[in-house]
Amino acid sequence: MLVTSSEWAAPEARLQRWQADQAGSWKEVGAAIPVTLGSAGMGWGLGLHLEAAGPRKREGDRRSPAGVFSLGDAFGYAATAPAGVRVRYRGADRRDYFVDDVASADYNQWRRIPAPSPNQPGERWGSFERMRRDDDAYELGLVVEHNAACVPGAGSAIFVHVWGAPRAPTLGCTAMSKDDLLTLLRWLDPAAAPVLVQAPRTALPALRLR
């Protein structure tokens, strides 16, 4: 998946699917998908790429991470994955959280408060993301493995998820329509080790894998 924007500060971008054929040549798959980014655009994240010049992603900066990233679990409000989705899926309920408390050992990790423990996340973490929300943003989503080493302050809880409205920016995730996200998830083949490549078009030449 390749997400490109016009500049670092742009909150809108396009996602194009790419797939290698048997000869190793890369081909576009389908039409480009409109997506929204963080309201502050993008900054280099921590992923499979080497460091490069440009703004850096930090906790709470409202930037989506730029770079090359592995993909984690798909998730959603349903108990089981939608038909045709092959990536590992995790159903989220009111006890599921993603921790963005930089002082916690659980930083940048999905955590579940098990029953019968009181469902009081504020007693465990100073800041957290509810994975079962009152809106449809996380009705369907995909974890982006930004900052997999959980470096405090480097950014957390980065997902591909359903947007609140067309062109509505996020707090640092990449969002699109539910229909487009479902198409994307059904296309992903975990056996192919898919990745997310995300950067302003002018920064793509600077991308180098570790």
What are these regions (language model features)?
Residues 177:
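Conserved "landmark" site that anchors the functional core of diverse proteins
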Residues 1-171, 180-210:
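Cell wall/extracellular polymer interaction/catalysis modules
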Residues 174:
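Residues that recognize and position ribonucleotide moieties
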